[in-house]
């Protein structure tokens, strides 16, 4: 019996404010379809699309701008399983396998979460410590791992 999981390819962005590196504030947004769930922008990679192209497309779709510069990317793809209540909605996928990018908003870029298909109803730029306090869901371990990596490399 085969027990291999079916993961959806996905990109995620840790978006730093345009004041980086002078100030390290990270964008986090509150999902409009779940109660008090804050997360980084993320989304699926379309068939034939590169991870970087998906990154820019997803940022435009979710936060209204793709005016960012890539600072770094996490060296591995990270996977997680969907919790029970989400797995039904995301069928046939059991979870996601993600490529994380650290990006900085370009000067003059404007965030607009009132997009064509809004996924968020609020957002903030916060410190790393605040990120860890705000994340209370199944992706927390991955968020901690990725942020710690970028901290160790001296990016944040």
Swiss-Prot record:
UniProt keyword Hydrolase, yes or no: yes
Gene Ontology BP terms: nucleoside phosphate metabolic process; ribose phosphate metabolic process
A Pfam short name: NUDIX
Cofactor(s) the record lists: a divalent metal cation
Motif (Nudix box): 43-64
EC number(s) from the headed UniProt entry: 3.6.1.-
Limits of the Nudix hydrolase domain: 6-148
Top-tier EC class: hydrolase
Keywords: Hydrolase
Gene3D superfamilies (UniProt xref): Nucleoside Triphosphate Pyrophosphohydrolase (3.90.79.10)
Cysteine disulfide links: none
One term of GO molecular function: guanosine-3',5'-bis(diphosphate) 3'-diphosphatase activity
HAMAP family with a match to the protein in the record: Nudix_RppH (MF_00298)
NCBIfam families, alphabetized: PRK00714.1-3 (NF001936), PRK00714.1-5 (NF001938)
Family that this chain belongs to: Belongs to the Nudix hydrolase family. RppH subfamily.
Biological function: Accelerates the degradation of transcripts by removing pyrophosphate from the 5'-end of triphosphorylated RNA, leading to a more labile monophosphorylated state that can stimulate subsequent ribonuclease cleavage.
Identification of the protein by name: RNA pyrophosphohydrolase
Organism: Campylobacter jejuni subsp. doylei (strain ATCC BAA-1458 / RM4099 / 269.97)
């Amino acid at each position: 019996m085969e027990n291999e999981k079916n993961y959806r390819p996905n990109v995620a962005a840790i978006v730093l404010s345009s004041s980086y590196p002078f100030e390290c504030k990270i964008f986090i947004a509150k999902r409009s379809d779940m109660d008090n769930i804050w997360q980084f922008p993320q989304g699926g990679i379309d068939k034939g699309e590169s991870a970087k192209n998906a990154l820019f497309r997803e940022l435009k779709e979710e936060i209204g701008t793709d005016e960012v510069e890539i600072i770094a990317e996490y060296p591995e793809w990270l996977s997680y399983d969907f919790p029970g209540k989400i797995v039904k909605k995301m069928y046939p996928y059991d979870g996601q396998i993600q490529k994380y990018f650290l990006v900085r908003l370009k000067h003059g870029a404007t965030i607009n979460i009132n997009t064509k298909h809004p996924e968020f109803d609020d957002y903030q730029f916060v410190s790393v410590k605040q990120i860890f306090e705000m994340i209370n869901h199944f992706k927390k371990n991955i968020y901690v791992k990725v942020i710690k990596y970028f901290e160790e490399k001296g990016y944040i």
